[in-house]
C-alpha cells in the first residue's frame, strides 16, 4: 500500500521541527497520523462567482475533521473574465490558468498533503485546478460555487430573463436609452455565482460531473440555494473516505487519472457537444488531458461532434433559458441520461460518488422511474429572486420539474435541436490543425457562408472597425495575432461578437480568429485557428478582400486564394526577418510575465499548455 504522503512531515525524530510547525497551525498530538487534506479555495472579492466562497473552505474543513482528517485551507487567484474583458486585462486570463495549476501543485507538494478538495467556480479556476489534480494524481473532489440567478427585468415592455451578455449587447445598441441600459445593468447580474448562461464557467463545472470528479448538481444548482450546502459537506467527508481507500486499502481507482480516463473525457466532450457548451471547454479539456497523459485530441472532438446531437440550448444560444432552467430539467444527469438512451456515452465508469456512472443515472436522472425522491426535490430548487452576495440564502422550489423531452429545456435524441452537436471542429488550409465553432449559437441560414475578408491585427482594431461601421454585411472579420503566443494570452473576442449583434450583423457576418471566444459569444464565430498567426499560420497571410469559405456541415474553413499567391505572400513575410509573423502597427505593452508565458505556450490545438521541452530544443 502507498504510504500517506503527509508522514514525510509528521513522522520520525528528524521531523520534530515540522511537527512543531504543524502544532502551531492547530494540529494536536492525537491528530498526527490522520490524512492531511488540502482545501484549495478560490475566494476573492473581485469575482461574483467567488465572492461567496469565503466560508466554504471552513465548511468543507469542518466535515473533513468530523470524518477524521486534518483540513488545511489555502487560496488561489481568480480573474473575472467579464471585468477583464475588452482591455489589456484579458491578456492575463488564460495565463492565469497555468498559475492556478502551479499554485495548487506547489502548495500540495510542498506540504505533502494526502488528498485535495478543489473549491472552484469561474472560467480559468476550474480548468487550472483540474490540471493540478491530474498532475498530482492524489484523491481529489471538486465542488464549485454554483451559477448566479438570471436577472429579471422589463425590457421594451416585455418581462424577460437577463444575463451579462444582454448588458453588453444592449449597451452598444442605440435603440436603447441610457435609462433602459441602466436598468439592465442593475439587474443582469443579480446574485453571487458564475454568470447565469452556459458560458465557460458553468460549462466547465458541468463537465466535472461528466468526468466523475464532482457530485450531481455541481454544474447547475444555484449558488444562492440552500441545497448547495450539501455538496460542500459531501465533499468533506467523501475526500477522507477516498484518502483512506487509497492509502489504507491500496485502491488506486479513487485517483483522478483512474476516474478521468479517456472514456470519461469522451463522455465529458459528448456532454459539452449536447449542451452547446463554451468553445473554451475544448481548450481546457485538451489541457487537462495532457496533464494526465490522456490521449485525447482534436481528432476525438471532431469524431464526437459528428454524431452527438444538440439536446439543450442555453443562453447565449437561447436567450430565455439559463442554468436555473437546466437544473429544473434535471441538470447534467438528465442530459447524460438522454445520451445514455441514445448509446452515446460509457456508463460503466467510476465516479467519486457512485460505483458507476450508470448507477448514478439510475438515482439522479429525473426521467427514470428509479430516480430517488431526494433527487426530484433537489432538482426543483428554484431562484429566490432577491439580489444577494450570500450563499445558501434561499430555499425556493419550483412546483414541478421540467420533464418534457420533446419541447422542454432538455430534449431526447428524437427531438434534438440538431442531429449533430453544439460544437464543431473545422479544418482546411486556414486551420490545418483545427478551429472551433459553437454551432449551437449559429443561425441555420449561415451554416454555409462565403464572404470577403476584413482583416484586423488586434481585437482593439476590430472593435473600432465594427463600431465605426467599417464592417459590412456579408464580410468575414479576421482578428489575428490574438493566439496564445501572438496576444499573448489568447484574448476572448466577446466584444467584437457582441458589437456585431448590436450593429445588426450577428446573422450577416462571420468572425474568424486565432484567439478565443467567451462562453457568452454566439453567431458564426470561429476561434482557436491553429496554427496561429504568430507561429506562421496561414491566417497571418490573409488580406482584406480575400474570399473565405466556411462550410460547417462539411467541417471546412478555406482561404480561396491560389497556392502561388499564398507562396508569394509567405516569401514576402519571411523576408521581413525579425519582424516576420508579428502584428503590424499594434501598440500593446507586454509585461515580462506575459512574455514568459508566450515563450513556452503551445497553440490552441494543444490546449495552449506550456511545453517546457521547447527549452531543450533551443
Curated annotation (Swiss-Prot):
Cofactor binding notes: Binds 1 [2Fe-2S] cluster per subunit. This cluster acts as a Lewis acid cofactor.
Matching Pfam families: ILV_EDD_C, ILVD_EDD_N
Keyword Calcium among UniProt keywords: no
List of catalytic residues: 518 (proton acceptor)
InterPro entries from the UniProt entry: Dihydro-acid_dehy_C, DihydroxyA_deHydtase, DiOHA_6PGluconate_deHydtase_CS, ILV_EDD_C, ILV_EDD_N, IlvD/EDD_N
GO molecular function: 2 iron, 2 sulfur cluster binding; dihydroxy-acid dehydratase activity; magnesium ion binding
Cofactor: [2Fe-2S] cluster; Mg(2+)
Primary enzyme class: lyase
Assembly and binders: Homodimer.
NCBIfam families per UniProt: ilvD (TIGR00110), PRK12448.1 (NF009103)
Protein name as it appears in the record: Dihydroxy-acid dehydratase
Gene name tied to this protein: ilvD
Amino acid at each position: 500500500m502507498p504510504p500517506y504522503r503527509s508522514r514525510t512531515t509528521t513522522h520520525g525524530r528528524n521531523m520534530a521541527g515540522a511537527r512543531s510547525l504543524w502544532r502551531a497551525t492547530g494540529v494536536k498530538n492525537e491528530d498526527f497520523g490522520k490524512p492531511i487534506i488540502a482545501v484549495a479555495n478560490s475566494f476573492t472579492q473581485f469575482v461574483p462567482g467567488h465572492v461567496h466562497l469565503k466560508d466554504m473552505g471552513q465548511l468543507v474543513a469542518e466535515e473533513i475533521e468530523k470524518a477524521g482528517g486534518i483540513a488545511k485551507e489555502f487560496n488561489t487567484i481568480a480573474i473575472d473574465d467579464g471585468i477583464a474583458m475588452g482591455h489589456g486585462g484579458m491578456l492575463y486570463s488564460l495565463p492565469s490558468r497555468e498559475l492556478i495549476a502551479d499554485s495548487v501543485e506547489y502548495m500540495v507538494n510542498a506540504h505533502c498533503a494526502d488528498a485535495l478538495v478543489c473549491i472552484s467556480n469561474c472560467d480559468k479556476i476550474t480548468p487550472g485546478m483540474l490540471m493540478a489534480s491530474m498532475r498530482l494524481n492524489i484523491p481529489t473532489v471538486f465542488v464549485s460555487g454554483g451559477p448566479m440567478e438570471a436577472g429579471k427585468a422589463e425590457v421594451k415592455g416585455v418581462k424577460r430573463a437577463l444575463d451579462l451578455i444582454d448588458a453588453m449587447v444592449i449597451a452598444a445598441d442605440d435603440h436603447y436609452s441610457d435609462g433602459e441600459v441602466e436598468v439592465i445593468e442593475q439587474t443582469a447580474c443579480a446574485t453571487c455565482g458564475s454568470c447565469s448562461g452556459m458560458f465557460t464557467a458553468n460549462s466547465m463545472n458541468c463537465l466535472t460531473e461528466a468526468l466523475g470528479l464532482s457530485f450531481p448538481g455541481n454544474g447547475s444548482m444555484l449558488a444562492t440555494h440552500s441545497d448547495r450546502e450539501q455538496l460542500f459537506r459531501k465533499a468533506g467527508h467523501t475526500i477522507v473516505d477516498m484518502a483512506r481507500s487509497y492509502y489504507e486499502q491500496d485502491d488506486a481507482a479513487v485517483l483522478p487519472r483512474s476516474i478521468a480516463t479517456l472514456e470519461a473525457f469522451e463522455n465529458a466532450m459528448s456532454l459539452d457537444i449536447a449542451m452547446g457548451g463554451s468553445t473554451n471547454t475544448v481548450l481546457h479539456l485538451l489541457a487537462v488531458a495532457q496533464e494526465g497523459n490522456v490521449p485525447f485530441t482534436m481528432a476525438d472532438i471532431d469524431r464526437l461532434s459528428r454524431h452527438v446531437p444538440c439536446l439543450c440550448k442555453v443562453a447565449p444560444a437561447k436567450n430565455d433559458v439559463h442554468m436555473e432552467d437546466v437544473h429544473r430539467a434535471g441538470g447534467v444527469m438528465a442530459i447524460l441520461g438522454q445520451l445514455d438512451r441514445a448509446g452515446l456515452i460509457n456508463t460503466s465508469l467510476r465516479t467519486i460518488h457512485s460505483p458507476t456512472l450508470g448507477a448514478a443515472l439510475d438515482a439522479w436522472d429525473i426521467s427514470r422511474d428509479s430516480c430517488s425522491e431526494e433527487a426530484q426535490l433537489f432538482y426543483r430548487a428554484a431562484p429566490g429572486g432577491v439580489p444577494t452576495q450570500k450563499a445558501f440564502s434561499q430555499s425556493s422550489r419550483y412546483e414541478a420539474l421540467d420533464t418534457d423531452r420533446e419541447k422542454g429545456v432538455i430534449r431526447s435524441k428524437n427531438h434534438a435541436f440538431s442531429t449533430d452537436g453544439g460544437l464543431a471542429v473545422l479544418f482546411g488550409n486556414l486551420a490545418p490543425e483545427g478551429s472551433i465553432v459553437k454551432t449551437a449559437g449559429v443561425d441555420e441560414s449561415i451554416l454555409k457562408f462565403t464572404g470577403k475578408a476584413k482583416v484586423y491585427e488586434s481585437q482593439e482594431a476590430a472593435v473600432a472597425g465594427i463600431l465605426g461601421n467599417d464592417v459590412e454585411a456579408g464580410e468575414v472579420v479576421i482578428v489575428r495575432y490574438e493566439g496564445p503566443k501572438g496576444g499573448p494570452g489568447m484574448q476572448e473576442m466577446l466584444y467584437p461578437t457582441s458589437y456585431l449583434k448590436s450593429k445588426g450583423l450577428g446573422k450577416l457576418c462571420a468572425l474568424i480568429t486565432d484567439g478565443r471566444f467567451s462562453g457568452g459569444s454566439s453567431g458564426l464565430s470561429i476561434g482557436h485557428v491553429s496554427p496561429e498567426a504568430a507561429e506562421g499560420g496561414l491566417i497571418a497571410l490573409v488580406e482584406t478582400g480575400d474570399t473565405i469559405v466556411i462550410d460547417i456541415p462539411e467541417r471546412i474553413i478555406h482561404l480561396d486564394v491560389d497556392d502561388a499567391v499564398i507562396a508569394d505572400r509567405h516569401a514576402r513575410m519571411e523576408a521581413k526577418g525579425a519582424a516576420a509573423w508579428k502584428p503590424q502597427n499594434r501598440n500593446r505593452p507586454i509585461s515580462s510575465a506575459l512574455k514568459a508565458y508566450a515563450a513556452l505556450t503551445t497553440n490552441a490545438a494543444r490546449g495552449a499548455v506550456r511545453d517546457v521541452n521547447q527549452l531543450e530544443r533551443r
